[in-house]
Amino acid sequence: FYKGYFINKKSFIPLIDAKIAISKDYLTINKKKDKWITNKTSRKIVHFLRSRYDCILSTSKSINHDDSLLNCRINGLNNNKPDLFIVDLNLRLKKKLSLNSYIGNRKIYIITNKKNAKRTLVYKKKGYKIILIKRLENKDDFNLLFKKIYKIGYSRMLIEVGLTFLNALLKNKTIHDLYIFKSSK
């Protein structure tokens, strides 16, 4: 319970946990084209997990692929829509996504290193907020980003990304706890 508090006060970053779903053969993409890799119970646990965080970080690649809402869909907790940070360094987030319907109910930030005013204006008009960073290549870059997120007011972050981005976070030792959901298929 106090772990997040101590991390916040010592490092001025959010508590950073991550979750990943993998198939029986350790893949993160479902080749059978089913909507989900894991089962209904795992999904309920993930929705409960999301309810415990004030923000979620994902990537445009993951969101574009899944068209995911990244919210909590448990009765009684379904009003809990953690704010969303989307790492989109090259501004490739699709314009038509299901999560656009939640912009009025939750803050959605796009993290980019592109200063393209025309492209960022399109997202701003939809209600996205833009966070500009120089790069995201090493531990210092990640810590700088996480300090910005903490400074905005977020103290607990759940990361839901693909294997490539997750590996970068693990390599740079920026994750405090990792939840792995392994499918029996």
Name each model-derived stretch.
Residues K3-I7, S11-Y154, T164-N167:
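Active-site ligand-binding patch in enzyme domains
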Residues L170-K185:
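Flexible, gly/pro- and Lys/Arg-enriched active-site loops
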